[in-house]
Amino acid sequence: MEAFAPLNPRAPFIWYGGDYNPEQWPRTIWDEDLRLMQECRFRVATVGVFSWTALQPAEERFTFGWLDQVLDKLAAAGCKVCLATPSAAQPAWLSQRYPEVLRADPTGRRRHHGWRVNYCPTSPVYRRLAAQMAAKLAERYHAHPALVAWHVSNEYAPACYCEQCAAAFRDWLRSRYGSLDELNRRWWTRFWSHTYTDWSQIEPPYANGEGSIHALTLDYRRFQNEMLLECFKLEREAIRQFSRDVPITTNLMRFYRDLDYRRWAREMDVVAWDCYPSVEDEPLDIALAHDLMRSLRDGQPFLLMEQSPSSQNWQPYNRLKRPGELRLQSYQALAHGAESVMFFQWRRSRGGIEKLHGAVIEHSGRSDTRVFEEVRALGQELERLGARTLGGVTPAQVGLLFDWENWWALEDCSGPTREKRYLETLRAHYAPFWRRNVPVDLVFWDSELGRYRLLVAPLLYLLKEGLAERLAAFVQDGGTLVTTYLSGMVDECDLAFEDGYPGPLRHVLGIWNEEIDALPPGQTNRLVLHDGRSFVCGHLCALIHSEGAEVLGRYGEDFYAGRPALTRHRVGRGQAFYLACEPEAAFLEMFYGELLATLGIAPVLETPPGVEATLRQTDRERLLFVLNHGREPATVRLPAGRTFEELLTGRRLREALTLAGLEVAILAEPLASSL
């Protein structure tokens, strides 16, 4: 893989900065803001995210003067700008004049004005005015010397269930299916006599309406995803009329269920996301989210658009980041592919729902606080680091298959248990690789599979057209596939495959799934391997038959004791494993550890528990990020005979590296081709 070019050649450095909302403050504070930003080495400010009313106090009146001053001041201070469109929160005048722009809740009831992302994505009025504002901003500022990126709207979110959406949904369905007969066939509406005889009879899946046709719910999710994406694209195209060479993005939200970020990433010039860990999150959870963002555009570095410099305000418990955690988490983002470290927000708001959200400058306005000191020290360190990490790629040999439509269909499915645990299962299969410092890409239904040696596809309930054939070809060509129970059950309309489970995967897996047993909490079974090792399993247990697959493990209890629970099928030059049950974590650690050894996939660096190591490779050098997530010192043995430059201290290291608690190191060594 070749390294990537800088996101914008006018800003070839790690983007350090964050959300800046000067419209909330008197002009007398602006110069002090800029002085303190320079002290922190802020290089990029995100401006204008929620400034619609400040820019357009009435439909016929625009007030850009204050923004002119802000951008000019930032440019004079040496700070670049990621300029946002303010469409995430419409003005009160807009909702009052055009009440049809307001979102409707899942019962179809129109919401009142307030909050944010409270618009109907199919509203022609909303679309017109949002695109108009984007065009005016681009026309006015496309040549501004501070401009380095466009930030469209903010954290696109939930579905709307209004009459406009219902009508647009019916049009969308006509385009998708062509005829009502075809829709009825694909939705299986003969069940419970729910056959539609006129398009006008189809409604959104209201909370107090139709909920028994899973294909309806699945299609409505697809439809709403497309409508919101159209809103993004309308603003993007409005910007591109005037600003063709500046990257355009929007900020995503981790594993957000309601939007298919793979489809969104195709329309973005760079992926950006907002990282807000909860108190329950472990470092591997954030690593997985970073890997998702890097993978959405097939390995392209991403932007960490927001993180709190300390606490949040919307979690059940808004824990302060302990000294050193902000720095460690920022470097973890860089380690997984980020090209920026940015905060929400610069100055804490005096009022509103986020007045207690963490910020670089607190209500006191002081710069002698713990948080400010940590932000300033990190900025100075990143300035010294320079551009060494930019464009670095992560050469992963392991792919973890994830699909939003599969998630939607699986979670909506009635049976065999209410708890499908898709994300929890994805995490469980990711964890053994993360703990071993083996890089992982998230892969998708349309990804290029040939670059991987091992592909893990848990709970692949819904199979998109052509995916089974591509997985079979991957195995035939020498790849190793691992999949699980609940895989290969339905097609894209949530119709069960007529020849049973695992549907089109049956040949490559060499098994047939007869039944699925759902075990209630507290009830378990055993997965017994052929060598006698035994592991607890439970939750869901598929009762399968081998059709050519080698049986590696069997159930140890209940009426299906002795039935296959783990199989391997050799096909062509590759192999496909089927795990019929949900095993304890110890099994996955053992299974993937042995599989990696067999395949010859090595960690980027051997480390003690609690120390994470990742690899980013530029055109000139390999960069090993080593992060001690523990509170105690840890020593890492370095590969024999190799010398590394530690970029944060300038030390030359051989044999060993000792890290204090929450400490970070970046070890650089030249590529052989660059020597």
Regions found by a protein language model. Name each.
Residues 18, 37, 45, 74, ...:
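Conserved, mostly hydrophobic/aromatic
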Residues 32-38, 46-109, 235-242, 461:
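Aromatic-lined substrate-binding rim segments of carbohydrate-active enzymes
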Residues 107-270, 274-288:
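Polysaccharide-binding and catalytic clefts of secreted carbohydrate-active enzymes
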Residues 1-46, 57, 72-76, 80, ...:
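N-terminal carbohydrate-binding accessory modules
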Residues 15-27, 50-65, 112-131, 153-160, ...:
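The substrate-binding groove and active-site-proximal loops of carbohydrate-active enzymes
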Residues 199-202, 245, 254, 265, ...:
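Carbohydrate-binding surfaces of carbohydrate-active enzymes
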Residues 25-39, 130-136, 253-264, 322-330:
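Short, acidic/polar
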Residues 12-14, 41-43, 75-81, 143-148, ...:
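Short, well-ordered coil/turn segments that N-cap beta-strands
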